[in-house]
Amino acid sequence: MGYGICLDLLREWCEKLLELQIHGTGQPTLDGGILCPACARVHGRCFDAIYPFLYLADRDGDQRYLEAAKQLFEWAEHTVSREDGSYINDTSGPWKGTTVFSVIQLVEALKYHGHLLEPDVYCRWKDRVKKAADFLRDFEEFEVCNVNYRITNSLAMLLCGEFYADDSYMQRSQELAEMAEQCFSESGLLIGEGRPVDGYSKKHCRPVDIGYNMEESLPSFTQYAFYTGDKKKKAMACKALRAHLSFMLEDGGIDNSFGTRNYKWTYWGSRTSDGCLFAYLMASQEEPEFAVGAWRNLKRLRACTEEGLLYSGPHMREKGELSCVHHSFSHAKVLAMILEHGLESRLCDGILPRAKMKTP
């Protein structure tokens, strides 16, 4: 079921991103970046498209994507790269925590598709990512900020530890993963996407954001658990995925109406996160019902795609709201990962937990 939809959707998004890539201005802080028609700017994380671009360059033999990926890398070096190894989130702000997302996709790009690059380019990229990995290893702020960062960095450090054969990364990965274990409630909900991360508010509440949990934190925790084979963490990941699946609507939308970061809520998830598909498909070997959630959400992404871009909801275009490119380049990474790992064949339809709930 659904065979081919991941590749078709990935090609559609990436073709539009190619169209929006800036060329020929002579300004290194512009050329290579991807212009957002909704925000009238170049988003600092647009070079997250490097991994899906290289995937398509490799799969389809399309030289355009290889050149676009290299241009994106150079754009990032001139614009958001910093001397300490970090990447800032945007030129208008100093936050460096999003370096973790850049490192994850760049390591995956080098691991699977680095052979497409010229030897000197490959070495330069590898050295640059190593510098970013060193920054992440020593960035202690992840221990006190929103929970998604300690979890995603545990995955980043794991990937870098394996790629660079560096035990210091592996040790840091394990430390952060152990910290993450403390952030799950008895019911399986992930807590800590807000302040206080490890405590209670004055009204004795805990910060929870369904969108970020399903599309960013749980996917990274699931990958960590399955990549390491840690049985305890695999069980925790499956319990959490099951608990959060109750917030998926029958049409594949996600209910994040009460989330601590619901200002980023979209009908299918959250604006700047990567998506829930890979996690649910990866864990579907343990619980086949998870593949149903992946299929429904994928269909919702397909339904919300118009003119080559992923819109935030099913009626946004007809209301005159333009689509932010962040939606497309972030979720393109997940589609590439699904195809990379051959998980598309697991997609299936069925009944979601929401449909089984009895109403009074």
Explain the meaning of each model-derived region:
Residues 1-2, 47-63, 101-120, 152-167, ...:
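Well-ordered alpha-helical scaffold segments within catalytic/enzyme domains
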Residues 1-27, 223-227, 231, 235-243, ...:
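Terminal, non-catalytic domain-edge segments
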Residues 1-45, 55, 59, 63-74, ...:
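Low-complexity, Ser/Thr/Pro/Gly-enriched N-terminal "stalk/linker" regions
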Residues 17, 53, 69, 76, ...:
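Buried hydrophobic core positions in alpha-solenoid tandem helical repeats
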Residues 19-47, 83-100, 136-151, 187-216, ...:
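Solvent-exposed loop and edge beta-strand segments that line ligand/cofactor-binding
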Residues 21, 60, 80, 113, ...:
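Alpha-helical junction/boundary sensor with strong preference for TPR arrays
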Residues 78, 89-138:
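Well-ordered mid-protein domain cores that form the structural environment of catalytic cofactors
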Residues 118-198, 204-205, 210, 214, ...:
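Eukaryote-skewed repeat-based solenoidal scaffolds used as protein-protein interaction platforms
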